[in-house]
């Protein structure tokens, strides 16, 4: 997996004199996985690489939010050629979420 970008929205808010609870967007993925999906339907590139938002709510609890891979498959009308890759990506994303959140 490659981390392509990390965007600290709270730091960007502070840079313009605004406040925001910790909110970080991470763009990551595997070029092989993404290319398989884009071979099926090139518009999948709109939602790739994968992204996850780590953020703190008003109660001080931290959350990890990301797009559901089944949603991505429906959104881009991905066919059977992408099914195995979508499943592998779902499994990988669930593993990442468990690691990051400790759940």
Give names to the regions the model predicted.
Residues 1-103:
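Feature detects long, helix-prone N-terminal segments enriched in hydrophobes
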């Amino acid at each position: 997996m490659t981390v392509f970008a990390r965007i600290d929205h709270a730091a960007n808010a502070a840079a313009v004199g605004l406040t925001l609870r910790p909110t970080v967007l991470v763009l990551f993925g595997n070029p092989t996985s993404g290319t398989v999906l884009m071979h099926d339907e090139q518009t999948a590139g709109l939602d790739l690489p994968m992204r996850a938002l780590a953020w703190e709510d008003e109660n001080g609890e931290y959350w990890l939010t990301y797009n559901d891979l089944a949603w991505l498959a429906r959104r881009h009308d991905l066919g059977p050629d992408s099914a195995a890759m979508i499943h592998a990506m779902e499994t990988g994303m669930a593993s990442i979420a468990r690691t990051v959140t400790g759940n």
